[in-house]
Curated annotation (Swiss-Prot):
Cell wall formation. Belongs to the D-alanine--D-alanine ligase family. The keyword Cytoplasm applies. The lineage of its organism: Bacteria, Bacillati, Bacillota, Clostridia, Natranaerobiales. This is D-alanine--D-alanine ligase. It comes from Natranaerobius thermophilus (strain ATCC BAA-1301 / DSM 18059 / JW/NM-WN-LF).
Amino acid sequence: MKKLRVGVLFGGRSGEHEVSLKSANSILNALDRELFEVIPIGIRKNGEWISGEAPLEELETGIKNQGNYAVSILPDPSKKVLWKLDPFEKISEIDLIFPVLHGTFGEDGTVQGFLDLCGIPYVGSGVLGSSLAMDKVMMKKILRRHGLQVANYYSFKRSEWEQDRDEIIFSIEKQLSYPIFVKPANLGSSVGISKVKNREELIQGIDLAVKYDMKCLAEEFIPGKEIELSILGNDNPKTSVPGEIIPANEFYDYNAKYINNKSKLVIPAPLSETLKTKIEDMGVEAFRVLDCYGLSRVDYFVLEDQEEVYINEINTMPGFTEISMYPKLWTESGLSYSQLLTDLIYLALARQQEKDRNSTDFSES
């Protein structure tokens, strides 16, 4: 059987560039080479695409490798090809892209739209699902509209903060009580997030958040268990066992997720059957109403005594490192890391086949 040519796309122009490299390293090592011909494609922080001998190592070390070269894909569905730019020549045909990109310019619908123009199938959600899930404010509005509980929040733009800090502070303190989380609206991996306990910390937290995004939000603190659920599928998604995170730090921040490895992961999470069912049902509903495909990880806060469940966020391209919850939850559910990647690739191909059924010609009959 002919191997599928899978381009693994990593790096990118977001604050989660390094997280993407860690995820890509794990994926490149786990893809089934009996089924797939793997083509690593890195994106430098300046946006340049590279391939060749060792693009991942170059991005990890910052040392240019003479065996790497600039590449691109053209928005021509008749030619699904990876091109070398200098000299301009064909490198390989591409059957599918696995966009291991986290955050802006990767997980927010931008790359997905480009790949749609190119006619190349890709793992994960499309433009709409990716962009809705990435924007925490829009995500919360839609989830709340569909009866899914989320924490109370106040959103604002960087320009508003720069024009009238006092008004923003007044509005936040009027609507929310300390402690408060301050977040960029369009970033993941806890980059730019602060937990603040007073006005001085609030100002510092907002100053940090606006460095990363033009839209931010302040969100009430929910003193519950941190629960995560992995979802896999297209029109009929299935769920993993839920897992609990017991953070080593005050909350599950960037260091806890990717560096110090001191946070405790409890899989499966010790929850009642009632809560497990509620978490699974809410996760699948969120996946559907946000128009997600392929995979997502849903994060929750759970108040056990009241049996209340709040959706914190949904990640359409969650971390894939060796300590990331998305693959860990599937491993504990009986699905190996390698088989998970294979399933994701075939789900992407199935979705592309469904999209290809759409007619692009119109004639009145």
